[in-house]
């Protein structure tokens, strides 16, 4: 995998210990709901739902929460909410590329908030829906190094059909094509016996990173945190090195 971001890793460790799990679970529930509405409530026949459920399980989202989100979509629970996906991108602080994935039932609220965040950060929004050239969509699985040896996880990942595995400071990063992600991740889960992963999702990975001084980097990370705290934002990607 090309590139490396120390700021992503710092945030990664912080996120693993984050007490605000309820907010994270709300975002997962929304993703599960949208996938179930679009393709039906059967996990086995709905790849998008299976992806969303596996992602939630990897972060220890309670089974009852997952079932509730699916039931809501299948009509067993009354709701009038209709969510649509929106993608925003832009630059902040000397060329850092930000990609924001959103699910919202109120476009006007979302659009107003995103514009406000970028304006206050001195950033510049690109055309809505555009994805910066530095990003490539990949299936991504990250596993704590303490849980398994490099030789063993490399053997499993290659047998699963992964295209690349990298040993980072504290974790292994495994990537594959998005189209084969469910197959690869489920093979790795079965072969390792792990049900919880640091990351298990289809992600956007940057090929180039922008290096900034610590003060500027901290401002960018504060901006990203503000985006992530928005109820309509599902994920934020950046190429801060």
Curated annotation (Swiss-Prot):
Source taxon at top rank: Bacteria
Any one of the GO CC terms: cytosol
Subcellular localization(s) per the UniProt record: Cytoplasm
GO biological process: regulation of DNA-templated transcription
UniProt keyword annotation of Cytoplasm present: yes
Pfam family, one: Transcrip_reg
Gene3D superfamilies: 1.10.10.200, 3.30.70.980
Keyword flag Transcription regulation: yes
Single annotated GO MF: DNA binding
Keywords for this protein: Cytoplasm, DNA-binding, Transcription, Transcription regulation
Family indicated by similarity: Belongs to the TACO1 family.
PANTHER family, A to Z: TRANSCRIPTIONAL REGULATORY PROTEIN YEBC-RELATED, TRANSLATIONAL ACTIVATOR OF CYTOCHROME C OXIDASE 1
Record protein name field: Probable transcriptional regulatory protein MYPU_6240
Organism, as annotated: Mycoplasmopsis pulmonis (strain UAB CTIP)
